[in-house]
Amino acid sequence: MSDSNTGTVKWFNEDKGFGFLTQDNGGADVFVHFRAIASEGFKTLDEGQKVTFEVEQGPKGLQASNVIAL
């Protein structure tokens, strides 16, 4: 289940370091934690930003990994 997906940031709370992504393929929203963002420095995402990511099964449901802002 780790194929590369594209989607949009639904929301991201930079104070708490997490949010959700909407998948372009119509799948369920995916949890994203700041540690999954593949960038240097302060890791955050903006609402509406396009991203690519992989989907993994986490302890509480789907979660994103290797998130790259487009």
From Swiss-Prot:
Residues 7-67 form the CSD domain. Its main location: cytoplasm. It is found in: Cytoplasm. It comes from Shewanella violacea (strain JCM 10179 / CIP 106290 / LMG 19151 / DSS12). SUPFAM superfamilies: Nucleic acid-binding proteins. This is Cold shock-like protein CspA. Keywords: Activator, Cytoplasm, DNA-binding, Stress response, Transcription, Transcription regulation. Induction: By cold shock. CDD domains: CSP_CDS (cd04458). GO terms for molecular function: DNA binding. One of its GO terms (cellular component) is cytosol.
